[in-house]
Amino acid sequence: MSTQTPQPIRGTQDIFGPDAEAFAFVVETFERVRKLYRFRRVEMPVFEKTAVFSRSLGETTDVVSKEMYSFEDRGGESLTLRPEFTAGIARAYLTDGWQQYAPLKVATHGPLFRYERPQKGRYRQFHQIDAEIIGAGEPQADVELLVMADQLLKELGIGANDPGAVTLQLNTLGDGASREAWRAALVEYFRAHKAELSEDSQDRLERNPLRILDSKDPRDKPFTADAPRIDDFLSAEAQDFFGKVTSGLDAAGVEWTRAPALVRGLDYYRHTAFEFVTDRLGAQGTVLGGGRYDGLMEALGGAATPAVGWAAGIERLAMLVGEKGEARTDVIVVVEDDALLTSGIEQVSRLRREGVSAELVASGSARKRFDKAVKMGAKAILALAMRDGQPAARFRVEDDAATALRGQLEAAVAKYGAQ
């Protein structure tokens, strides 16, 4: 048997200290904001049948062909650790009778899994927050989700003092007919330049031509710049839909910029596509993204159902939030005489029940315990000691932040008598 300590798996992380506080701050802020917008909390399985993702994401996408953690269970069924939330939520909408709640607003957060190259802010086990509106085909649903995302980022403090730090980039993919006409025009255009495109784009030309538009390869840039734009193919209905989204954002005071090359490669995406981007994280600049996916339910065997949603990586948001120190302890209860240990336990328990964060210092040298408590930096210290053979208490308020605690501390002193 090996005596070597197993090392962490590449692409995973042990989150602790200020990083854990920043992570928790993102989740807590998301939970508070989703309640303001009346999104219902859902919890989804960490693994699903592989077909849930292969049918929703597409067999030829990189996520399905290269990045999914798939395995056979003991019954021989192919299962996959979830690489994203939307497909599982869509499956539940169809299998669990959630249609009765349409339009349904749901939100969740948790770990996801993709086998990709780890880099700054990107892991093989990573975490996302996610919000979806299912069963609402009106532009107002898109507006609500975008306004919610904008408020979330502002309440996280991202870009609060630097308005240019995060930008909402917005595009329309049109309705089904508009998208197909645009796709055909792109195929014709790129085929004329196929030999000069990158290898990835040559491959995408037949499988997923819209994805050529967001290629980062310098060889593709001259051709993507002059490629046909969706605006030339939009139906009147699609133009009206996008106009209502942008006017809704303007009314809500959400700044946005048009990004005509912003696309979603899968055929079930329609109308609105969006990303909140930043230059604060290097080349990987998207911090929150989403769009309308009106054709997804049909891909999973359900009836046509309009839907729109977004997701954001918690790790990346936490990086933008910056380090968050742990909150200061309200009161440290110091037991300066071992005979008063049970009294110390009584006091620290009482404070916690009253909603006051408290720590007990009752070990080590009795003479050094008070100094130890001072170094811990709490707002106040309650010390218990024996004086002339009798229990006695005293408290020390470290700063104005502890003023509200005086009543509880004075009650403790009154019980034992002042030192």
From Swiss-Prot:
* Encoding gene per record: hisS
Kindly provide the name given to this protein in its UniProt entry: Histidine--tRNA ligase
Q: Which reaction does it catalyse?
A: tRNA(His) + L-histidine + ATP = L-histidyl-tRNA(His) + AMP + diphosphate + H(+)
Which Gene3D superfamilies does this one have? Anticodon-binding domain, Bira Bifunctional Protein, Domain 2
* Gene Ontology terms: biological process: histidyl-tRNA aminoacylation
Q: Name one GO cellular component term.
A: cytoplasm
Q: How does it assemble?
A: Homodimer.
Instruction: Name where it mostly resides.
Output: cytoplasm
Top EC class per UniProt?
ligase
Record keywords: Aminoacyl-tRNA synthetase, ATP-binding, Cytoplasm, Ligase, Nucleotide-binding, Protein biosynthesis
Please name one Pfam family that this protein belongs to: tRNA-synt_His
* A molecular function (GO) term: ATP binding
EC number from the UniProt entry: 6.1.1.21
Which residues are the signal sequence here? Answer: none
Q: Which InterPro entries match?
A: aa-tRNA-synth_II, aa-tRNA-synth_II/BPL/LPL, Anticodon-bd_dom_sf, His-tRNA-ligase, HisRS-like_core, HisRS/HisZ
